[in-house]
């Protein structure tokens, strides 16, 4: 039969090219030994495999950056690769192993469902995606990241911190002044060894959220927990999971990195550490390459009709109460106590759509740079945030306030006209500059003298339905500080609190009736090496999981659904000339815009196809 020899010729991609064709006969199918693609820290030896397919003998090879493949007749990896792992383990105590696979058969949505079953909504896990804004259209971000089964969980409520070490089967509880010191101290014990082949994305570490009330660990005297509004949900203030296993999708190069971080156990041999790490990696890879992957509901989408879900009438504040709070805030502004304050209220929407279905719909309704589906203890977060809270990479910190908003135009010409109008709006530009100054002050607290600068002032960022005025503030972290110190300095940002920030937050405690929880805090990841990428928790729905409802709903299919309550919080920036009616309407519009994802999920996944209609157009988010 014919044999085709194929080899990879392009670095970074799994590409193949036909080299030669020969003819020979194979009387009996050969026996194939088990195959393991070698993983390395730098440059592994070559590995290849001959396969008989029909009447052709195929020779496959693959290449990553500086990686070659060769035939390996056993599960043992090469001496060269093992030597490199051994050297890395001598330098540090965290060493990543990875496997690169084709991603053309897999999506981040499907990969998440392979790791977390549909009925396991209490399992800590996450899916991070990104859509980069563009002038005419948005482009999908290069990387998506999926993770499940954290080895350690940290849950803080007030000053009580619970640490669940699943690897050691230990659960501890202690009272501390600052719960963020707990993960910070754990990280001080690490010495991670990076490798060049891994992508420029989050590849493992802490994932979770920091609530708005995290600021009370820093401003203990002016913003004590005792002065906080009613805590009607009892959600954790800090909720983190440590993920040794992640899957990173590279949408540009059409491949996925399956990554496992090996914790070097000094009481075990290097061989044992290496073998256990490879077994964990093999197990993780097999879970996303299941012969029978989970079936995802297809959904039916009919856009641009006029069918919407129920109006968001239930809120933590009546319209009259919110307007009275606006009037009182204006009195403080006129008295010179503050310049601006952001007052929010929390709306409620009941639904039989599953939060994961709502996340899938949100990707269509409101694609944004920080898309997140995050399951943690006590709640599920479904987020579509446009704004960085803090980015820290190689000790360079970035804060990018977004303030000043106008809708997108229906045509490119109208877009340009609206952009000029936005930049000519003195009120919105003045508010933006005030918040940029606040950002400079926050970044300056933890930066080297002279390193703080505004790189982009009053830039315009285009999103799916709106455009924002954006500025970028950068600084270089002081030598004796870490990313955690930078997070303490900026959380929460002025765009969700006001200016001066602490005084505005004192008034928020007086004027808002319930705690904000995750809203206006931050969510994201802290890498093993200390880099941090935290998004501002705006346009974020919170689904409490610690409350169960007896209501079940049965559709034409046999699946029975539980009822969920979505908490959608939105705020408005109050200044001296604010109109209470307009500010209340702004909160309603922002919340209703996010609720369009629930409308789409209900019509796509719950109703019959012929009734599936929804309009995702949003004028102002």
Curated annotation (Swiss-Prot):
One GO CC term on file: chloroplast
Top EC class, one word: lyase
InterPro entries per UniProt: ADC_synthase (IPR005801), Anth_synth_I-like (IPR019999), Anth_synth_I_N (IPR006805), Anth_synth_I_PabB (IPR005256), Chorismate_C (IPR015890)
Reaction(s) catalysed by this chain's protein: chorismate + L-glutamine = anthranilate + pyruvate + L-glutamate + H(+)
UniProt-listed Enzyme Commission number(s): 4.1.3.27
Gene3D superfamilies, per the entry: Anthranilate synthase
Pathway(s) where this gene product acts: Amino-acid biosynthesis; L-tryptophan biosynthesis; L-tryptophan from chorismate: step 1/5
UniProt keyword annotation of Lyase present: yes
Quaternary structure and partners: Heterotetramer consisting of two non-identical subunits: a beta subunit and a large alpha subunit.
Family per similarity comment: Belongs to the anthranilate synthase component I family.
Function: Part of a heterotetrameric complex that catalyzes the two-step biosynthesis of anthranilate, an intermediate in the biosynthesis of L-tryptophan. In the first step, the glutamine-binding beta subunit of anthranilate synthase (AS) provides the glutamine amidotransferase activity which generates ammonia as a substrate that, along with chorismate, is used in the second step, catalyzed by the large alpha subunit of AS to produce anthranilate.
Protein name, UniProt field: Anthranilate synthase alpha subunit 2, chloroplastic
Protein species of origin: Arabidopsis thaliana
Designated gene of the protein: ASA2
């Amino acid at each position: 039969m014919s044999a085709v020899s194929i080899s990879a010729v392009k670095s970074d991609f799994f590409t193949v090219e036909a080299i030669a064709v020969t003819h020979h006969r194979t009387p009996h199918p050969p026996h194939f030994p088990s195959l393991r693609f070698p993983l390395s820290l730098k440059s592994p030896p070559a590995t290849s495999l001959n396969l008989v397919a029909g009447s052709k003998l195929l020779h496959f090879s693959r290449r990553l950056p500086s990686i070659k493949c060769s035939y390996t007749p056993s599960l043992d990896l090469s001496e060269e690769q093992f030597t490199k792992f051994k050297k890395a383990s001598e330098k540090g105590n965290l060493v990543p192993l990875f496997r690169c696979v084709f991603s053309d058969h897999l999506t981040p949505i499907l990969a998440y469902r392979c790791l977390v079953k549909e009925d396991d909504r209490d399992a800590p896990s996450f899916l991070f995606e990104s859509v980069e804004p563009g002038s005419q259209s948005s482009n999908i971000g290069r990387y998506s990241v999926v993770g499940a089964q954290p080895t350690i969980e940290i849950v803080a409520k007030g000053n009580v911190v619970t640490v669940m070490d699943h690897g050691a089967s230990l659960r501890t509880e202690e009272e501390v002044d600052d719960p963020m010191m707990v993960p910070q101290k754990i990280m001080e014990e690490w010495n991670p060894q990076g490798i060049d082949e891994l992508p420029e994305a989050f590849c493992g570490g802490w994932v979770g959220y920091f609530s708005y009330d995290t600021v009370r660990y820093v401003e203990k005297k002016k913003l004590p927990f005792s002065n906080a509004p009613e805590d009607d949900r009892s959600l954790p203030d800090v909720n983190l999971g440590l993920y040794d296993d992640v899957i990173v999708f590279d949408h540009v190069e059409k491949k996925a990195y399956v990554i496992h971080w090996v914790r070097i156990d000094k009481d075990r041999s290097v061989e044992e550490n290496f073998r256990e790490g490879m077994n964990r990696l093999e197990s993780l890879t097999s879970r996303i390459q299941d012969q029978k992957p989970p079936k995802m509901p297809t959904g039916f989408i009919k856009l641009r009709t006029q069918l919407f879900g129920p109006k968001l009438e239930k809120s933590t504040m009546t319209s009259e109460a919110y307007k009275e709070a606006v009037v009182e805030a204006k009195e403080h502004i006129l008295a010179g106590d503050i310049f601006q304050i952001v007052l929010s209220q929390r709306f409620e929407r009941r639904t039989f759509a599953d939060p994961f279905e709502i996340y899938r719909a949100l990707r269509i309704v409101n694609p944004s740079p920080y898309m997140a589906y995050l399951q943690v203890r006590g709640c599920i977060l479904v987020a579509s945030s446009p704004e960085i809270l803090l980015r820290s990479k190689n000790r360079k910190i970035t804060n990018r306030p977004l303030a000043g908003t106008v809708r997108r135009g229906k045509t490119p010409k109208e877009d340009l006209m609206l952009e000029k109008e936005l930049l000519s709006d003195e009120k919105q530009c003045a508010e933006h500059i005030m918040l940029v100054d606040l950002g400079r002050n926050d970044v300056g607290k933890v930066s080297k003298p002279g390193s703080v600068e505004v790189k982009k002032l009053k830039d315009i960022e285009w999103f799916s339905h709106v455009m924002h005025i954006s500025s970028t503030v950068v600084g270089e972290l002081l030598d004796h500080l870490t990313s955690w110190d930078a997070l303490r300095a900026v959380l929460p940002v002025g765009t969700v609190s006001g200016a001066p920030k602490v005084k505005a937050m004192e008034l928020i405690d007086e004027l808002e009736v319930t705690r904000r929880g995750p809203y206006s805090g931050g969510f994201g990841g802290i890498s093993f090496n200390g880099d941090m990428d935290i998004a501002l928790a705006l346009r974020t729905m919170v689904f409490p999981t610690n409350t169960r409802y007896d209501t079940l709903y049965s559709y034409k299919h046999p699946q029975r659904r539980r009822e969920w309550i979505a908490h959608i919080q939105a705020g408005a920036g109050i200044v001296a000339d604010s109109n209470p009616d307009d500010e209340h309407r702004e909160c309603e519009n922002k919340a209703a815009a996010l609720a369009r994802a629930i409308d789409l999920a209900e019509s796509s996944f719950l109703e019959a196809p012929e009734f599936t209609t929804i309009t995702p157009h949003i004028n102002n988010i």
